[in-house]
């Protein structure tokens, strides 16, 4: 994230809660890279202040009076695309609306705690600062590219009745890790795959209330079965397993099959689920029988794990910088020479299918 280093980014905080506005202003102004230029209590105030102040990034509450945050976001992305970080409640409804917001163009989200708002948010201060700075630094052309991809996705109809999956085990395994921008990237990647592939395990940095909604949403629109991973779940052909938020996902080999293992061990690289934890478990469980892709994301989680997979003989891919919303995790992997191939997102699915065609099992 060196580009834009030294610049001070203008932030507009949009939230109907005066307390939340106050807390966010205090947190964001702690960073020398950020300046909160104003706040707005509803989308109509926000619209006027965006015109007057031209902020670099806005934080936007999902639930607001007069016009809900989702409607405002859709209008904003249609008329004036800009980086938006959503502020969402940790509820099932909040998760569903936030996933909608990411599909309509929001870059990332921050989950509000259900209780003890001030203490809970202040514990996330560094995460909030990092996410807002990361969003502000996204080039305008990448925002436009994201919008184009989303429009293409919206034009695709939901899947009809899917064929029954074959509950067959396999020697092969596919792993994916992602963070910021990863929800869109994972959806696009899976959209290019099919049921005739080994089981796919995914670690995406996501809170607990969101992972199930994300898995259910993918399951409705993709031909393969997508589910939130559970402890001892057998990993079978044509199925996708999403790590549940607040749990590490590991893969272990039991006899002739792979199974999921969940753990509440401490966060790794500040994350649980951690991509490194998933990848490291696959080094032991599958080694050269695996392939792994590290997609867009902030930080370096997964880079060291991808290197260890590479050294174990697995086929490894890092998403390229041009197609990544944030080239943190895959960029760190490239610096470690952990990737066999560095590919744009739209070419990764074809490489996964080619790898399996050349290495069936």
From Swiss-Prot:
Post-translational modification here is noted as:
Phosphorylated by CheA. Phosphorylation of the N-terminal regulatory domain activates the methylesterase activity.
- Entries under InterPro entries matching the protein: CheB-like, CheB_C, CheY-like_superfamily, Sig_transdc_resp-reg_Me-estase, Sig_transdc_resp-reg_receiver
Residues of the active site are: 179, 205, 301
Can you say where in the cell this protein is located? Answer: Cytoplasm
Query: What do the Gene Ontology cellular component annotations say?
Result: cytoplasm
Q: Which GO terms describe its molecular function?
A: phosphorelay response regulator activity; protein-glutamate methylesterase activity; protein-glutamine glutaminase activity
Q: Which residues carry this modification: 4-aspartylphosphate?
A: 61
Q: What does this protein do?
A: Involved in chemotaxis. Part of a chemotaxis signal transduction system that modulates chemotaxis in response to various stimuli. Catalyzes the demethylation of specific methylglutamate residues introduced into the chemoreceptors (methyl-accepting chemotaxis proteins or MCP) by CheR. Also mediates the irreversible deamidation of specific glutamine residues to glutamic acid.
Q: State the protein's name.
A: Protein-glutamate methylesterase/protein-glutamine glutaminase 1
């Amino acid at each position: 994230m060196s580009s834009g280093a030294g610049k001070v980014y203008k932030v507009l905080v949009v939230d109907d809660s005066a307390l939340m506005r106050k807390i966010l202003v205090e947190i964001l102004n702690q960073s020398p890279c950020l300046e909160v230029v104003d706040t707005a209590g509803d989308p109509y105030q926000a619209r006027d202040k965006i015109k007057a102040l031209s902020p670099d990034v806005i934080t936007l509450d999902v639930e607001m009076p007069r016009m809900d945050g989702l409607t405002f976001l859709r209008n904003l992305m249609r008329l004036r695309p800009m980086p938006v970080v959503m502020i969402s409640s940790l509820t099932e409804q909040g998760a569903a609306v936030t996933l909608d917001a990411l599909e309509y163009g929001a870059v990332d989200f921050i989950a509000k705690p259900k209780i003890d708002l001030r203490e809970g948010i202040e514990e996330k201060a560094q995460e909030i600062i990092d996410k807002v700075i990361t969003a502000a630094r996204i080039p305008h052309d990448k925002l436009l590219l994201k919008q184009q991809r989303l429009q293409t996705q919206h034009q695709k109809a939901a899947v009809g009745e899917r064929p029954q999956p074959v509950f067959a085990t396999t020697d092969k395994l596919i792993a994916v890790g992602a963070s910021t921008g990863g929800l869109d990237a994972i959806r696009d990647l899976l959209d290019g795959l099919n049921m005739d592939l080994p089981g796919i395990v995914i670690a995406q940095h996501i809170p607990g209330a969101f992972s199930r909604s994300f898995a259910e949403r993918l399951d409705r629109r993709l031909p393969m079965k997508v589910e939130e991973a559970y402890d001892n779940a057998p990993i079978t052909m044509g199925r996708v397993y999403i790590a549940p938020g607040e749990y590490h996902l590991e893969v272990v080999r039991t006899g002739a099959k792979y199974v999921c293992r969940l753990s509440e061990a401490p966060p790794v690289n500040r994350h649980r689920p951690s991509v490194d934890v998933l990848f490291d478990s696959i080094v032991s469980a599958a080694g050269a029988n695996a392939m792994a892709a590290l997609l867009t994301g902030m930080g370096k989680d997964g880079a060291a794990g991808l290197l260890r997979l590479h050294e174990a003989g697995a086929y490894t891919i890092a998403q390229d910088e041009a197609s990544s919303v944030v080239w943190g995790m895959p960029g760190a992997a490239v610096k470690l020479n952990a990737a066999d191939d560095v590919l744009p997102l739209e070419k990764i699915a074809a490489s996964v299918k080619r790898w399996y065609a050349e290495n069936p099992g």
